Amino acid sequence: MKAVCVISGGMDSSTAAFIAKEQGYEILALHFDYNQRTMKKERECFNLICDDLGVKSREILDVSFIAQIGANSLTDKNLTIQKTGVKSGEIPNTYVPFRNGIFLSVAAAFAEKEGADALFIGVVEEDSSGYPDCSENFIKKIESAINAGTSPNFKLEIKIPLVHLSKTQIVKKALEIGVPLEHTWSCYEREDKACGFCDSCRLRLKGFKGADTKDTIPYI
């Protein structure tokens, strides 16, 4: 069995990839560069996680056209990354329009070429920033569209093992299956030391606190 794993270098996608390995899949690792602020750090963490997994097949794809579309603070440095938390029902300016839809479409093409059985992505719906392309409903619908638009001899299952877990549950699961969380990066803003205040840092720290364990990556 082969699975394409979309790995950003973050905690969630890395844990999803380790789950794929635990389930016996041969991992085809896929990473996307889209000129985000922390692109170099994320790429570094992707390679570290691939080394930890013993992955031989790894691809880094340039989808920098996402930055040309803009409309988000991850790629547009003229926008300030929100650090005040996210209110219920609010979509923060760190939301990259249809990013996961783009990633999954490209990953599906790669999976079809490679004859993969599954595609793992670490989306989280329950304890997240509220991005619409991280919901189970969206994933199921794009899975249906992918299978309608690819070869009849190809059927892809998109696996989202973390979608209904809290950040605390994700940290606990990661520790249970041996994910080296010190090799992952979550900060939206910085590559040297995590800011500790962007929504992604807040959620990460919340998970570690709930799991009663220390996050060993550097913070300012």
Curated annotation (Swiss-Prot):
One of its GO terms (biological process) is queuosine biosynthetic process. Zn(2+) binds at residues 187, 195, 198, 201. InterPro entries: QueC, Rossmann-like_a/b/a_fold. Its cofactor is Zn(2+). Pathway: Purine metabolism; 7-cyano-7-deazaguanine biosynthesis. ATP binds at residues 7-17. It catalyses: 7-carboxy-7-deazaguanine + NH4(+) + ATP = 7-cyano-7-deazaguanine + ADP + phosphate + H2O + H(+). GO terms for molecular function: ATP binding; ligase activity, forming carbon-nitrogen bonds; zinc ion binding. Keywords: ATP-binding, Ligase, Metal-binding, Nucleotide-binding, Queuosine biosynthesis, Zinc. The keyword Repressor does not apply. Binds 1 zinc ion per subunit. Its EC number is 6.3.4.20. Catalyzes the ATP-dependent conversion of 7-carboxy-7-deazaguanine (CDG) to 7-cyano-7-deazaguanine (preQ(0)). PANTHER family: 7-CYANO-7-DEAZAGUANINE SYNTHASE. Belongs to the QueC family. HAMAP family: QueC. This is 7-cyano-7-deazaguanine synthase. It comes from Campylobacter hominis (strain ATCC BAA-381 / DSM 21671 / CCUG 45161 / LMG 19568 / NCTC 13146 / CH001A).
